[in-house]
Design a protein with these regions (language model features):
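Alpha/beta enzyme core
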Residues: 3-38, 42, 48-188, 195-205
Length: 205
């Protein structure tokens, strides 16, 4: 495989991301232009920009990942559902929702499952990835979070938001994959600053 083809193949696994709170419309347009140029899988953006991204990316083959309950996951279920429904109406092709970490750590798995399931149902045919924020969890909590996601019908489990104390680690990704098997896919959130550290995490799952 030629080097250029390898780059395109790798780029097709990456969500090109701008989730900054001060991102402007021009920033999102630039993100979309880069995603089209380099053939990234999706642009990952805050939900207020989905309609703009949809217009910018129409016909390009690049998807849109709208982030719901981002970055804390502490919004009410009703708020997450409303955000998911609006994102779908605006043209998102994927949803990244953040798990309710407080209820998870407290052992309230019924709440966690209900919260995720409500968003999955609101999203309809749009796949939902659930961000666990692994840097705040121990191994037992990561395993339990993965099981809750499977029970709720999530399509993916994802390591982190990029807004907390750490990102993906090989250990966390391997533990998640071991737990979900083929029931869910696993996604590592990494900053692609170097081929070794960044992409090791990406390809474990």
């Amino acid at each position: 495989m030629a080097q250029k083809e390898k780059i395109v193949e790798i780029n097709g696994l990456i969500d090109h991301t701008n989730l900054k709170q001060n991102a402007t419309a021009e920033d999102i347009k630039k993100l979309c232009a880069e995603a089209k140029q380099y053939k990234f899988a999706t642009v990952a953006i805050n939900s207020c920009w989905v309609s703009l991204a949809h217009a910018e990316l129409e016909g390009s083959g690049v998807g849109i990942t709208s982030c719901v309950g981002f970055p804390l996951g502490a919004a009410s279920t009703a708020a997450k559902v409303a955000e998911a429904k609006q994102s779908v109406a605006d043209g998102t092709t994927e949803i990244d929702m953040v798990i309710n970490g407080g209820h998870l750590v407290a052992g309230d798995d019924d709440y966690v499952i209900s919260d995720i399931k409500a968003v999955v149902e609101a999203a309809g045919s749009v796949p939902v990835k659930v961000i666990l924020e692994c840097c705040l969890l121990d191994d037992e909590q990561i395993v339990r979070a993965c099981k809750d996601c499977m029970a709720a019908g999530a399509a993916f489990v994802k390591t982190s938001t990029g807004f907390s104390t750490g990102g993906a680690t090989v250990h966390d990704v391997a533990l998640m994959k071991q737990t979900v098997g083929d029931t869910c896919k696993v996604k590592a959130a990494v900053v692609a600053v170097g081929r070794d550290g960044a992409f090791r995490g990406l390809f474990v799952a």
